[in-house]
């Protein structure tokens, strides 16, 4: 099949959604399909054997309309030659679904954009139960300039309504987890297929085994991600303090909570090594060496790429049980799940202090990762593309 993958985010500068799209592209190519990536992300014109068409991105006011138009025009050019257009994110999806005619159109939903204007389901630092009118007014408080606030809620309502209407036009909708699928099933969009992200354990092991470029402690607990409230940055040091591992915390990431974390660490006597954002290769090398990966996320995680790659490397994981995380990790088999900060600290303590726990989780993680391999998932993607699923 000739498959066009459309996405706003893609390597080399990308988070989990971009790298997951790359993994899908390479796996489809490896299965013999003709794959082209169309993206507004900056970078080169190929990703391994997969050609990449880079479009001019945009920011600022009216970004949604302009980006949707950019994708629509680009996809209209490839539509005649493609068997499938598979959109990977909100704006690429809106562009693909605005085509008047074309090939089969599939949309993957990787976060909460169809049900939450901000795509996070977080408001004022806490989980938002639903986008009711009252909750919307609370949500915009402090987020937008005062002069724009009266228009915000009507616009948010229109935005969510139009996204739902667009999704209903898709030939197939994929959710990356059952947690996301449950949200989508509250909308009138038809059937939703749950298809998780792909991880190629052979590739991540090869990268992780390459020579290190970061200078890291001999033994450490690792955090990877944005230092933001929804990622649990405020709970990192309290969890480490509760765990009493005696190990330093390595933070590969940055964000608005950076200074708070450093102050907490100083107060608690926790040694922190924070080189900031790291290339994916350095992240994988650090994962392979870490005594444990701590994952304190407080928002409803759709399906974390960090956790997927940690599983593939057999890294022992201590994670907060939010969103789709329990769909990746079976408690006490492929990782340890926690419900609060003290529980997370206890999980870290068990991993670091008990070699038998660490050994069991390493084996369970590597075994669990096989469920997300290209060989396990590509046939299911092909069935969706053919319309037989």
Q: Language-model segments: what does each one mean?
A:
Residues 331-342, 350-356:
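Conserved acidic donor-binding segment of nucleotide-sugar-dependent glycosyltransferases
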């Amino acid at each position: 099949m000739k498959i066009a993958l459309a996405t706003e985010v893609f390597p080399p500068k990308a988070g989990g959604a971009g790298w997951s799209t790359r993994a899908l592209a390479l796996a489809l190519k490896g299965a013999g399909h003709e794959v082209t990536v169309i993206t507004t992300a900056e970078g080169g014109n190929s990703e391994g054997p997969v050609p990449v068409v880079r479009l001019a991105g945009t920011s600022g006011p009216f970004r949604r309309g302009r980006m949707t138009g950019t994708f629509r025009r680009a996809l209209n050019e490839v539509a005649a030659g493609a068997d499938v257009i598979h959109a990977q994110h909100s704006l690429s999806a809106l562009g693909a679904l605005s085509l008047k005619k074309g090939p089969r159109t599939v949309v993957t939903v990787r976060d909460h954009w169809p049900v939450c204007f901000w795509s996070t389901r977080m408001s004022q630092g806490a989980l938002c139960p639903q986008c009711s009118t009252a909750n919307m007014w609370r949500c915009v408080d402090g987020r937008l300039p005062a002069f724009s606030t009266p228009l915000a809620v009507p616009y948010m309502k229109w935005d969510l309504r139009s996204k739902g209407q667009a999704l209903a036009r898709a030939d197939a909708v994929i959710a990356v987890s059952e947690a996301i699928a449950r949200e989508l099933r509250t909308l009138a969009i038809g059937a939703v297929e749950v298809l998780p992200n792909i991880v190629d354990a052979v590739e991540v092991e090869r990268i992780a085994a390459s020579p290190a470029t970061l200078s890291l402690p001999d033994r450490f607990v690792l955090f990877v991600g944005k230092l933001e409230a929804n990622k649990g940055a405020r709970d990192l040091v309290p969890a480490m303090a509760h765990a009493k591992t005696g190990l330093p915390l390595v933070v590969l990431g940055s964000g608005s909570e950076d200074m708070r974390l450093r102050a907490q660490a100083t107060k608690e006597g926790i040694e922190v090594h924070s080189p900031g954002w790291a290339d994916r290769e350095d992240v994988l090398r650090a994962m392979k060496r870490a005594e444990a990966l701590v994952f304190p996320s407080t928002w409803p995680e759709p399906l974390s790429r960090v956790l997927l790659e940690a599983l593939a490397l057999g890294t022992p994981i201590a994670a907060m049980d939010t969103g789709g995380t329990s769909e990746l990790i079976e408690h006490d088999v492929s990782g340890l799940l926690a419900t609060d900060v003290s529980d997370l600290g206890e999980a870290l303590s068990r991993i670091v202090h008990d070699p038998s726990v660490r050994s069991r989780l390493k084996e369970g993680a590597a075994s669990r990762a096989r469920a997300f391999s290209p060989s396990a998932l590509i046939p299911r993607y092909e069935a969706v593309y053919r319309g037989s699923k």
